[in-house]
Amino acid sequence: MLFPISMSATEFLLASVIFCLVFWVIRASRPQVPKGLKNPPGPWGWPLIGHMLTLGKNPHLALSRMSQQYGDVLQIRIGSTPVVVLSGLDTIRQALVRQGDDFKGRPDLYTFTLISNGQSMSFSPDSGPVWAARRRLAQNGLKSFSIASDPASSTSCYLEEHVSKEAEVLISTLQELMAGPGHFNPYRYVVVSVTNVICAICFGRRYDHNHQELLSLVNLNNNFGEVVGSGNPADFIPILRYLPNPSLNAFKDLNEKFYSFMQKMVKEHYKTFEKGHIRDITDSLIEHCQEKQLDENANVQLSDEKIINIVLDLFGAGFDTVTTAISWSLMYLVMNPRVQRKIQEELDTVIGRSRRPRLSDRSHLPYMEAFILETFRHSSFVPFTIPHSTTRDTSLKGFYIPKGRCVFVNQWQINHDQKLWVNPSEFLPERFLTPDGAIDKVLSEKVIIFGMGKRKCIGETIARWEVFLFLAILLQRVEFSVPLGVKVDMTPIYGLTMKHACCEHFQMQLRS
């Protein structure tokens, strides 16, 4: 039954005025689209929450499906915040490379302000000349203590020396586990080995596999990726920050612990610093700070706090991405014994057993390289880049994108795009090999995992080298497996870097 609602002419007029005023404010707050351009298309969203429910637990999958309907440039809302989503290799390359200056910003998201007190080189909204100079400084330090050769060592570079040492320790540790409980969770031990490599580069030291302080930090890292992954509702709906949120609280605690750890390491370096005797990246940054050197393009001086932030960025990026890549690789190896055997046959043919693999062997091991590429592509363990934002009003593919617009870059979609890949859901390293057995360079460049353009991961080259060398040394010496009947869960868990479920049933034996 319907009940009539009585309304006087005055009340009706007042309601109409309020409605028109609200409508006008909403329209006025929306940027005016220049002639010849149009707004990016997108689905209808719910009031207040926008498309938050549509994104679900796997935003990369939801947005990939959405791109099939609306195209490579689409727009959604999370809360009341508009977000442009980019898909498609050509579109993303156009935005991040050819129009790199337009898309090099970072959105001012709440969770980003919790990282390094809001001064993180990777997450800070700053994208100006000072940021660029600090990024170059970090790149140079990383290069000097990883790719550069160590005159006191027989290895080709510092990175090779550190990885070779840690891979041997890892094998010994796994042997002890096989002699004891007879099984292990590989992630638990790989993460310490990889962390020791970046610790050697940044701090000139390593840790035991049972070092409690280090374990407490690296084991909390999964929460970091869960919170800062693209689409966190707390970044777009402010009220959620004040409601009970265990993940967000753990994230705050993790960042405080990481910062305190880095602060302690930098202080120790200050106490033992010797001019002319630079031991690692932290020393090189302290030297820069003390000499108050000026960058050639920007007047950049480093405070003690900035040193901590740069080292924290390098440390965080240096262990999480590589650990995740190696961990996924081991999962694919036990799921595909045929592939593991082919890699080992190639290692035996090219290198043999009399010496350890070296970085210089990489170009002679195409099947190994194809396996790594397929692991990157199939897992797409970095589904989105860290969110970008536009630094000025711009357009892309005929669509208008105003300054300050948050931009999600869907790397998962590229790596599973049926226009680029035959049977993308199938794990097939051979897809990257030419008929004569070499790496297909054109196809390999279509795998996107480290971003593109001006915000591309500064450690990409080192990460690729490190993953290769760890796997080559391990697979030359040992064989990985799981017991018959054990089901391995390969379902990715969404985050900034997607992890797989914990697998405690790994086994290892030395190759005969």
UniProtKB/Swiss-Prot annotation:
Topology of this chain in the membrane: Peripheral membrane protein
Effect seen on changing R464C: In allele CYP1A1*9
Induction of the gene: By 2,3,7,8-tetrachlorodibenzo-p-dioxin (TCDD).
Gene3D superfamilies associated with the record: Cytochrome P450 (1.10.630.10)
GO biological process: one example: long-chain fatty acid biosynthetic process
UniProt pathway: Steroid hormone biosynthesis; Lipid metabolism; fatty acid metabolism; Cofactor metabolism; retinol metabolism
Annotated GO CC locations: endoplasmic reticulum membrane; intracellular membrane-bounded organelle; mitochondrial inner membrane; mitochondrion
Catalytic activity: an organic molecule + reduced [NADPH--hemoprotein reductase] + O2 = an alcohol + oxidized [NADPH--hemoprotein reductase] + H2O + H(+); estrone + reduced [NADPH--hemoprotein reductase] + O2 = 2-hydroxyestrone + oxidized [NADPH--hemoprotein reductase] + H2O + H(+); estrone + reduced [NADPH--hemoprotein reductase] + O2 = 4-hydroxyestrone + oxidized [NADPH--hemoprotein reductase] + H2O + H(+); estrone + reduced [NADPH--hemoprotein reductase] + O2 = 6alpha-hydroxyestrone + oxidized [NADPH--hemoprotein reductase] + H2O + H(+)
Keyword set, alphabetical order: Cytoplasm, Endoplasmic reticulum, Fatty acid metabolism, Glycoprotein, Heme, Iron, Lipid biosynthesis, Lipid metabolism, Lyase, Membrane, Metal-binding, Microsome, Mitochondrion, Mitochondrion inner membrane, Monooxygenase, Oxidoreductase, Steroid biosynthesis
Binding site residues for heme: C457
Effect of I462V: In allele CYP1A1*2B and allele CYP1A1*2C; displays 5.7- and 12-fold increase in catalytic efficiency in the formation of 2-hydroxylated estrogens, 17beta-estradiol and estrone respectively
Residue positions the entry lists as glycosylated: S67
Location, primary (coarse class): endoplasmic reticulum
Enzyme Commission number(s) from the entry: 1.14.14.1, 4.2.1.152
Tissue: Lung, lymphocytes and placenta.
Effect in UniProt of substituting P492R: In allele CYP1A1*11
One of the record's GO molecular function terms: oxidoreductase activity
A Pfam family of this chain: p450
Summary of the function given for this chain in its UniProt record: A cytochrome P450 monooxygenase involved in the metabolism of various endogenous substrates, including fatty acids, steroid hormones and vitamins. Mechanistically, uses molecular oxygen inserting one oxygen atom into a substrate, and reducing the second into a water molecule, with two electrons provided by NADPH via cytochrome P450 reductase (NADPH--hemoprotein reductase). Catalyzes the hydroxylation of carbon-hydrogen bonds.
Protein family per UniProt: Belongs to the cytochrome P450 family.
Protein name per the record: Cytochrome P450 1A1
Annotated gene: CYP1A1
